[in-house]
Amino acid sequence: MAQISKCSSLSAELNESSIISHHHGNLWADDFIQSLKSSNGAPQYHKRAEKLVEEIKNLVVSEMKDCNDDLIRRLQMVDIFECLGIDRHFQHEIQVALDYVYRYWNELEGIGIGSRDSLIKDFNATALGFRALRLHRYNVSSDVLENFKNENGQFFCSSTVEEKEVRCMLTLFRASEISFPGEKVMDEAKAFTTEYLTKVLTGVDVTDVDQSLLREVKYALEFPWHCSLPRWEARSFIEICGQNDSWLKSIMNKRVLELAKLDFNILQCAHHRELQLLSSWWSQSDIAQQNFYRKRHVEYYLWVVIGTFEPEFSTCRIAFAKIATLMTILDDLYDTHGTLEQLKIFTEGVKRWDLSLVDRLPDYIKITFEFFLNTSNELIAEVAKTQERDMSAYIRKTWERYLEAYLQEAEWIAARHVPTFDEYMKNGISSSGMCILNLYSLLLMGQLLPDDVLEQIHSPSKIHELVELTARLVDDSKDFETKKAGGELASGIECYVKDNPECTLEDASNHLIGLLDLTVKELNWEFVRHDSVALCFKKFAFNVARGLRLIYKYRDGFDVSNQEMKTHIFKILIDPLT
C-alpha cells in the first residue's frame, strides 16, 4: 500500500548509492529457513492421524446415538473441531449434526425456552447454534436473540459470576461477531458481552470459574473473529485445551486433542517445504541484493497460510507470497526510491510489458523491472496451465490499474495536493493491491474459474470491493502517523479532515473505524450468502481480509515485522507443538 514520501517529489535523479532504507532488514536468512527440519511429516505420523480420524468418527456416531436429541452436544462437537483446526476431516459428521440441529431450530425461540434454571443453558445452546448455522450458510435470523432479554431490554444475566453464565456470555459474544448490516440486536449483544467479559477478566471474584474458560475469554477479547484466522485459532485452542484437565477426562477429547496436535505439526512440515522454495526463489534473485528494498517474503507467506493452509492450495500460497513480495518492492520504488519522471517511465513500461523502455533508468530500477517481468510471466504461465486458457491480457490490465493508482499518489505528493476523501478512497482501493494479489491466487487454487464466476469473486464483484476497502481502511487507520512522518500529505484521515474542517484527527480516525466495522458486516453477508461461487474462493478472499486485521492489530506488521509478527511466524511456521 503506497506511502509516497517527500523524496518521490524530487526532480533530481536518484542513484543507487544515494538511497537509504528506513526499514529493518530481512529477519529470515535463507540458511535458517533451509535448516528447518522435522520428523513430524514422516509416514508413521500420517498413519497415526488417519487412524485417529477413523476412531473419532466412530466415537461421534456412538455418542450421537447415546445423546439422542441433545442438540448442544452436537453443536459443541462442531465447535471444538473447528476451533482445533481439524474440521476438514469431519465434513460429513458436521453436516449431519447441523442438519439435525436445524430441523429443531425455531426462528422465534431458537433452541428451547425453559424455566429460569434452564434458561442459561438454552441461551447458550441458541447462541452456539446461531453462530454455527450462520457460518455454515443456513438461513437463521438474529431476531431469535430478542427472546433472551428481560423486560428492560437487557440480556438475561445474574449479578454473580458463575461459570455457566460466563460460558453463555462468551458464546453470545462469539455469535454477535457474525453480524450483518442493520442487525441492531447483534450490536447490542456485542456491547453487552464485551463489557461483561471484560469485567470477568478484571474482577477478583472468579474463583468458581475454570481457568481454561478464562483463557478462552481472554483469547476471544484479544483476537475477535475478524482477526482469528484458522491456524492462529488452532494453535491457541490446542494450548488452551491441553491445560484443561476436566475436559481431557473424556476419551474422545483426548483423541481429538492428539489428532489436532498431529495435524498441526504435519501441516507445518509441508509449510516448511513451501517456505524453503520461497526462500530459495528470493535469495537467488538479483533483487535480493538491493538492500534498500524491504524483504518480507516470509511475512507474506504467513499472511496467506494462516487462512488458507490446506495441502491442496500449495501453488496458490507460493504465488500469493511471491506477488505480495513483488508488490512491496514496487511500493518501495513508488514510495521512496523513484522520481516522478522515473515512475512515469516505469508505469509506461508495465503498460507495454516492455523492458527496453527502462533502459535509460538507473540499474536498480532496471533490475526491479526485470524482477517484475520475470515473476509475473512465470506465474502467468502457471495460470495458463491451471485455467487451460491464456489469462495474460486480463492480468496485465490488472497490473496496469494497480500501478496507475500508485502513480496517481506520486503525482499528488509531487504537487503537494490533498484530494477529497472520495477521490482518495477511490484511488486508494486500487493502490491497496488486493486486485492483483488475489487474482493470481484465485486462478491458482487448482479449480477452473470461468469468466462468469471470476466476475463474481474478483473485480468488480462486491466481495472483492469489500476486501479492497478493508485493506485500505486497515492500512490508513493504523499507519496514519507513520505516513505523516514520512511526508505523505494524502491519507484517508487527512483527506477526511480537509473535507470536514470541523472534525479533529480523532474524529476522522473514528470515522474510518466506523467504515471498517460496516465493511466487516458486509463481508460477513457476502461470505455466507448463497451464490454460484465455490466456497473455497470466497473463503480465500475472506481470510485475506481477516489476515490483515491480525497483522495490523498492533501496528503495520509488514513494515515493522521484528516484533509481534516475528512471534506469529515462530508460533505458526517454526515451532512445532509438543
Curated annotation (Swiss-Prot):
Enzyme kind, highest EC tier: lyase
Binding site for Mg(2+) 2: 331, 335
Cofactor: record remark: Binds 3 Mg(2+) or Mn(2+) ions per subunit.
Cofactor: Mg(2+); Mn(2+)
Pfam families in UniProt: Terpene_synth (PF01397), Terpene_synth_C (PF03936)
Superkingdom as given in the UniProt entry: Eukaryota
Binding site residues for Mg(2+) 1: 331, 335
Entry keyword annotation includes Lyase: yes
Keywords: Lyase, Magnesium, Metal-binding
Pathway: Sesquiterpene biosynthesis; Terpene metabolism; oleoresin biosynthesis
Motif DDXXD motif, residue numbers: 331-335
E.C. numbers: 4.2.3.58
Keyword Lyase among UniProt keywords: yes
Reactions listed under catalytic activity: (2E,6E)-farnesyl diphosphate = longifolene + diphosphate
Residues annotated for Mg(2+) 3 binding in this entry: 475
Gene3D superfamilies: Farnesyl Diphosphate Synthase (1.10.600.10), Terpene synthase, N-terminal domain (1.50.10.130)
InterPro entries, alphabetized: Isoprenoid_synthase_dom_sf (IPR008949), Terpene_cyclase-like_1_C (IPR034741), Terpene_cyclase_plant_C1 (IPR044814), Terpene_synth_N (IPR001906), Terpene_synth_N_sf (IPR036965), Terpene_synthase-like (IPR050148), Terpene_synthase_metal-bd (IPR005630), Terpenoid_cyclase/PrenylTrfase (IPR008930)
GO terms, molecular function: lyase activity; magnesium ion binding; terpene synthase activity
Function: Terpene synthase (TPS) involved in the biosynthesis of sesquiterpene natural products included in conifer oleoresin secretions and volatile emissions; these compounds contribute to biotic and abiotic stress defense against herbivores and pathogens. Catalyzes the conversion of (2E,6E)-farnesyl diphosphate (FPP) to longifolene.
UniProt domain comment: The Asp-Asp-Xaa-Xaa-Asp/Glu (DDXXD/E) motif is important for the catalytic activity, presumably through binding to Mg(2+).
Alphabetical list of PANTHER family matching this protein: OS04G0344100 PROTEIN-RELATED
Protein family: Belongs to the terpene synthase family. Tpsd subfamily.
Protein name: Longifolene synthase
Natural source organism: Picea engelmannii x Picea glauca
